[in-house]
């Protein structure tokens, strides 16, 4: 009506100006009238969106089979319980104040799906209609199928107390108010990635090392975002949808798969830049000094990203990830402790020596080896090189320069970092170690702390009096760390397997020095730490057709591997040269002078641990023993594993890394993947050291009369390594992490048993031979 009236009025008024004015006035009046009409009419109009006129029924399958899962399997679920859809209505006015009121309807489902026979470890990913869902956006409760699992509270609330089953022995999930709008207001087709480890290996894991230590934000349990440009931001530490951050996803899965886990060694890296001890600086580094836009600033030891040194490049990207920010390490410590686990802080040195470096080589090369092992840091020139500094006062001076002058009192803690108040250019080993000790204290303390690992080239350096200056520094650091962290933190050093038991210089002198005994006996040291990468086999492909001299029937013979833990190479015999290894010319390990072959047997832990130690200068045994007290402290394996590669037990200490001089595959290996190699290696160690093992021999791991525990503390066998980058993002996302192809060190036999999915409806495949497949058995 307003349209007609105002149109006529506009035409009349515009007619004063002639026909054109009348037309314009009519149009203007019509528009104004239309607006008034719409406001009057729409203000009372009510529009309703689509609404379900009836239930969309979905049914359970009567008599459906219940699968039994082995390994990692993607399965659909069977509906076992549901309610009617919940309907919610939302009314709001559209447009301006005079717009219509619109009511929209949303629907939510409450349902339970049976998965498989329990007990499973857990569920990793979930798909709805083939698309992975973000677990942060939905409420899903997972029941693993134990025989004592409780009734779900939602089912009990709907069915009434005492009327709801717990579905014990059945793994199932409950969806609580699952939004259906994205699925056409229907229940989508769900699939679940179910984890159920095979065998007992995962249940025996009580300690792991958590890597990578080189990741600027990867250890943060909080979501870190980076804004590259206005309106364009992405997560820096979340590459999966089944947890809020990469670290959370990794720790969730670790605890699912290893129910008896107690200890996590948190690896955190600073970088060395030179193999010459006197020139080497150890400092935090970043992947790029121009990185910006992060929701949390990167700071380490008071150094910001713009002031830090960037790691070198290898190929098309950084050779390493950067040092974890101080704040991320403190947060990671708190997160791990909040999960009921104990933290061992593991300060780690990686060597950033680029392939195109021109640094003088202490070992006599034209340049230093690219990206070397930290155990190569030594004097300049190195021992047994012409003009060596070893066994001179220059060795002590170079070690002193390497360690620096930092004092434990020169650190100040803030909420996000630990500041160093000493000389700004002091990037010595003492600053590095004491920084982490103060960081641990700022995070509320840790259960254990390592004051170093595998610094063999430094611990064996001697001064002019045949003293070991770096060992003295480690002793002093142990005392400092004890003051910082208190009596409740265990302290040790992770010695290389070829380092822990003594130093036997290959110079024909006959010298034997138990060079680390001053450290092992030190009152601030609680355990003897060993990175155990001792070989357990000597298998070649030719042994398939001829007898293996060690009685192995196959490359990973279970009995043979177990016997070799205290036998074989490094115990009964050794190879005097690589040529001798090729020809299998074995030399027996003996001690004709004093009848103590354990002195030379790096595998004879019982002999080394149970006896007093006497140095031999020039081959003559000293009259007095070292400071070591027999059976006085437990042994921890601060690292233990063999790579998941063909013939891994032949040489467990090597891993492929194309950029590094250390890159190698085990002796006589094809380089192909073998998860079975790692599995059998770990099983052999578990049977040998664990008193609960059926074939345990008490003499292999005796009890100390001094502290009442076993020689090797089973709870402190730290397996190397569990990755904080969760599967499947790592190793598949090579656009994010360049080392995805080098993941042979990951604990594959704990993390996965995957390659193909096998369905067995006719035969029972529960035998121990099921190792590398994901299987489903239907009953």
Model-based region annotation:
Residues 647-762:
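Aromatic-rich peripheral "rim/lid" segments of glycoside hydrolase catalytic domains that contact
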Residues 363-395, 470-480, 484, 514-515, ...:
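Acidic, His- and aromatic-enriched active-site or binding-groove loops in soluble protein domains
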Residues 206-227, 262-466, 484, 490-497, ...:
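Substrate-binding cleft and catalytic face of glycoside hydrolase catalytic domains
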Residues 2-4, 23, 27-219, 229-236:
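Polar, S/T/G-rich
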């Amino acid at each position: 009506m307003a349209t007609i009236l105002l149109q006529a009025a506009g035409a009349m008024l515009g007619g004063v100006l002639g026909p054109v004015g009348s037309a314009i006035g009519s149009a203007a009046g019509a528009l104004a009238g239309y607006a008034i009409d719409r406001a009057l009419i729409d203000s009372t109009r009510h529009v309703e969106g689509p609404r379900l006129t009836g239930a969309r029924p979905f049914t359970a399958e009567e008599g459906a089979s219940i699968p039994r899962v082995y390994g990692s399997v993607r399965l659909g679920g069977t509906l076992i319980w549901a309610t009617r859809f919940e309907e919610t209505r939302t009314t709001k006015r559209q447009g301006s104040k005079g717009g219509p009121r619109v009511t929209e309807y949303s629907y939510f489902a409450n349902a339970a799906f049976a998965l498989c026979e329990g007990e499973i470890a857990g569920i990793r990913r979930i798909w709805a209609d083939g698309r992975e869902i973000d677990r942060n956006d939905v409420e899903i409760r997972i029941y693993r199928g134990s025989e004592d699992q409780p009734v779900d509270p939602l089912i009990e609330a709907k069915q009434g107390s005492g009327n709801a089953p717990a579905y014990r022995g059945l793994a199932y999930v409950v969806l609580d108010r699952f939004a259906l709008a994205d699925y056409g207001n229907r229940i989508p087709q769900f699939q679940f990635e179910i984890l159920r480890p095979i065998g007992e290996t995962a249940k025996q894991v009580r300690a792991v090392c958590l890597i990578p230590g080189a990741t600027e934000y990867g250890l943060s349990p909080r979501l870190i975002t980076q804004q590259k440009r206005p309106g364009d931001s992405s997560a820096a530490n979340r590459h999966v949808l089944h947890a809020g951050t990469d670290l959370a996803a990794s720790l969730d899965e670790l605890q699912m798969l290893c129910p008896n886990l107690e200890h996590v060694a948190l690896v955190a890296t600073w970088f060395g830049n030179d193999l010459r001890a006197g020139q080497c600086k150890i400092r935090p580094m970043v992947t790029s000094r121009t990185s910006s836009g992060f929701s949390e600033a990167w700071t380490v030891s008071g150094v910001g990203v713009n002031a830090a040194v960037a790691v070198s490049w290898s190929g098309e990207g950084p050779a390493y990830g950067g040092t974890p920010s101080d704040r991320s390490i403190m947060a990671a410590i708190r997160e791990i402790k909040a999960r009921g686990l104990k933290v061992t802080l593991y300060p780690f040195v990686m060597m950033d020596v680029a392939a195109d470096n021109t640094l003088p080589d202490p070992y006599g090369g034209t340049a230093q080896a690219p990206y070397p092992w930290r155990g190569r840091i030594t004097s300049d020139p190195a021992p047994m090189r012409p003009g060596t500094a070893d066994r001179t006062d220059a060795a002590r001076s170079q070690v002193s320069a390497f360690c620096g002058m930092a004092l434990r009192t020169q650190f100040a803690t803030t909420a996000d970092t630990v500041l160093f108040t000493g000389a700004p250019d002091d990037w010595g080993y003492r600053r590095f170690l004491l920084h982490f000790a103060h960081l641990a204290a700022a995070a509320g303390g840790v259960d254990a702390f390592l004051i170093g690992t595998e610094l063999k080239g430094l611990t064996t350096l001697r001064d002019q009096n045949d003293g070991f200056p770096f060992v003295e520094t480690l002793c002093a650091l142990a005392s400092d760390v004890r003051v910082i962290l208190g009596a409740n933190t265990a302290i040790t050093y992770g010695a290389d397997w070829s380092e822990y038991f003594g130093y036997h210089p290959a110079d024909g002198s006959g010298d034997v020095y138990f060079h680390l005994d001053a450290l092992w006996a030190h009152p601030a040291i609680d355990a003897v730490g060993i990175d155990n990468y001792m070989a357990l086999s000597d298998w070649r492909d030719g042994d398939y057709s001829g007898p293996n001299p060690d009685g192995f029937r196959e490359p990973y013979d279970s009995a043979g591997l177990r016997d070799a833990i205290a036998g074989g190479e490094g115990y009964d015999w050794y190879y005097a040269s690589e040529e001798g290894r090729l020809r299998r010319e074995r030399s027996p390990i003996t001690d004709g002078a004093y009848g103590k072959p354990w002195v030379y047997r790096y595998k004879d832990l019982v002999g080394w641990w149970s006896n007093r130690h006497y140095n031999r200068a020039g081959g003559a045994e000293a009259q007095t023993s070292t400071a070591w007290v027999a059976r006085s402290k437990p042994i921890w394996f601060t690292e233990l594993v063999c790579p998941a590669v063909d013939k891994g037990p032949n040489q467990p200490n090597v891993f492929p890394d194309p950029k590094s001089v250390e890159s190698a595959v085990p002796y006589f290996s094809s380089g192909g993947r073998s998860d079975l190699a790692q599995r059998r290696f770990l099983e052999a160690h578990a049977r040998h050291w664990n008193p609960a093992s059926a074939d345990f021999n008490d003499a292999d791991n005796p009890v100390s009369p001094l502290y009442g525990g076993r020689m090797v503390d089973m709870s402190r066998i730290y397996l190397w390594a569990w990755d904080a980058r969760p599967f499947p993002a790592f190793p598949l996302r090579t656009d994010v992490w360049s080392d995805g192809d080098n993941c042979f060190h990951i604990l594959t036999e704990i993390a996965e048993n995957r390659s193909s999915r096998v369905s067995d409806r006719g035969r029972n495949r529960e035998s121990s031979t099921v190792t590398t497949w994901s299987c489903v058995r239907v009953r």
